[in-house]
Design a protein with these regions (language model features):
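Terminal leader/tail segments of proteins
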Residues: 1-103
Length: 103
């Protein structure tokens, strides 16, 4: 299993799409996994969830579990599977449960 590190993100994490701020958080977590770029996971309370529609996409990571995906509703049109969340991740990454990450 690759080494996975989860730490509080420093500063403010902001997600923008189509000119709109979709998320802004000082409580985000940064997940670093060997062989992958770091990923910010943002609490749902810091996300404009009205911009996100659940999609039918599900993916599985052997180290984190099953992810549900979301389409982003933007002025310019939907952005398919723009975000994902591990609702019930494996114990080793339980800190990201229910948080949302964006591509």
């Amino acid at each position: 299993m690759p080494e996975i590190r989860i730490t509080p993100a420093s500063g403010t994490v902001v997600v923008r799409a189509g000119g709109a701020v979709i998320a802004e958080s000082t409580s985000a977590l940064m997940l670093e996994e060997d062989g992958h770029d770091p990923v910010f996971y943002i609490p749902r309370g810091d996300i404009g969830m009205t911009f996100l529609d659940p999609s039918a996409t599900r993916t599985t990571c052997p180290h984190k579990g099953e992810a549900v995906h979301f389409d982003l509703v933007a002025k310019s049109g939907p952005i398919r599977d723009a975000a994902w969340s591990y609702e019930t991740p494996h114990d080793a990454v339980a800190a990201i449960a229910g948080m949302v990450a964006f591509y």
